[in-house]
């Protein structure tokens, strides 16, 4: 499927997205106070300084993102008061995990992953303006990946490696 076709589908989905979100809110799968983040709108300001965006969809990928953030901190990143992490997730459970780490001193902000509509992703990127992005996930979000690579230079996709590591770790 081409990106044009994919975006046409997103334009059609825009019409039913509010109903879909309402059902997810009622079933407890969405944080009712943070739905705006799914549309690329944040109530939080971007901190001044360097911002590294780490994205992991669910708990397992968020654990990997936190491990990467901790490794970066051990190597000096985030210790001078002018370097931060933006951690994005898709699930409430992963968000709670990240929130606990932030309370323990991780210089980070958590946001929910924006929907993959090009306008939403652009709004998200315009607001956060990350200096670097690393996606630690197995899902594929065409607009998020494409627009991120056009927005910033330092971008990494670790989901292929995670699949390899998952097989290795699972066998140990």
Predicted segments with their positions:
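Short hydrophobic helices that act as membrane-entry/anchoring signals
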Residues: 2-25
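Active-site and donor-binding regions of nucleotide-sugar-utilizing enzymes
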Residues: 18-172
